[in-house]
Design a protein with these regions (language model features):
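Conserved N-proximal alpha/beta basic substrate-recognition cap immediately N-terminal to
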Residues: 12-115
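Short, solvent-exposed loop/turn elements at beta->coil junctions and helix N-caps
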Residues: 40-41, 178-183, 271-272
């Protein structure tokens, strides 16, 4: 690795990063990976690189890397206090780590998003019984890879889930009970990938009832089952991804507002459309696992585009 890299990439899942690292090497970019799963940093050491790019994931704990998230957050805050440029930095990562804060941001922007109740004790939901419609979606505040997301029918069922397995609260001891919104399963949900504030591509994702919608071919390959730490909660066909060139301009404009408000450098925004015509935005992803097969239908390699962006930032 170069002793004085221009770029340092924070990460915790080497398989996800292989295409990006290969593209950086092809282009001759002086970069260095920084694996936050087993790391240390000095608060007195100055930044080594001109640019840092955060690719750490909230789902790190699912791979036994629980300590990666606080290390990444602390390191980025230190770097930024020292004046370093960090793409998808500490504030963006903190937003990605909290579905509750994401929901509040969307509401503040006047964007339709599922009603949510955040809680750290299942019994406390009873005080909000008048706000809940059933079924509802139970999901962790620190999400990732669709883990621990369930459709539930009652407060009693929620209480039973945590009583049966207290470790369900981990890693952050916060959950959301969120409005359940049906959508056309043939249309799926929509994910918009952004790079530098501009739409890179849009895709439709047919979930088949699954919640792990990770676009990385490592997790959801085009030709079969992936290597993923999240077992499928239901017996269902694999998740399918389709290029969506006809994505409505209004949806793109709304997503751009989210990207700008979140100060997201690279990432994905997800929404669904309900049978009664609501377009509901519900997820902000800073760690964007790009889908080469979808981007190929638009005529480009998405990782080459990311390298174009990183090189432009180095020259800025």
């Amino acid at each position: 690795m170069p002793t004085t890299p221009d770029l340092i990439v924070l990460h915790e899942h080497p398989e996800w990063q292989k295409p990006l690292f290969a593209a950086l090497q092809r282009r001759g970019v002086a970069f260095e990976p920084f694996d936050v799963t087993r790391a240390a940093f000095s608060n007195t050491a100055p930044p080594r690189a001109r640019l840092y790019f955060n690719q750490a994931s909230p789902s790190a704990y699912l791979r036994g890397n629980t300590r990666a998230v606080p290390l990444a957050l602390a390191y980025m805050r230190t770097l930024q206090q020292q004046g370093a440029r960090v793409l998808n930095g500490a504030d963006v990562f903190a937003l990605e780590l909290s579905k509750s804060v994401q929901a509040t941001l969307l509401q503040t922007l006047g964007i339709d998003t599922p009603r949510s109740i955040t809680f750290n004790e299942a019994a406390a939901l009873r005080a909000h019984a008048h706000e809940i419609t059933w079924p509802a979606v139970l999901k962790p505040d620190q999400g990732g890879s669709g883990a621990r997301i369930e459709v539930v029918e009652s407060i009693e069922q929620v209480e039973a889930i945590f009583r049966r397995d207290p470790s369900y609260w981990l890693p952050d001891n916060l959950f959301l009970l969120q409005e359940y919104l049906p959508h056309d399963p043939e249309q799926g949900i929509v994910r918009l990938e952004f790079l530098g504030g501009q739409l890179l591509y849009a895709m439709r994702v047919k979930t088949h009832g699954r919640f792990n919608l990770c676009p990385s071919p490592v997790c959801n390959p085009d030709d079969g089952d992936g290597i993923c730490e999240i077992p499928a909660a239901v017996e269902a066909p694999p998740v399918e991804f389709f290029a969506y060139p006809e994505v409505p301009a209004a949806a793109v404009a709304t997503a751009q507002r989210i990207v700008q408000a979140a100060r997201l450098d690279v990432g994905g925004i997800e929404y669904l459309e309900t049978p009664d015509g609501r377009r509901v935005f519900y997820d902000i992803n800073a760690n964007s696992n790009l889908r080469p097969s979808v981007a190929a239908e638009f005529g480009f390699d998405p990782f080459e585009r990311v390298v174009d962006y990183l090189v432009a930032q180095l020259r800025a």
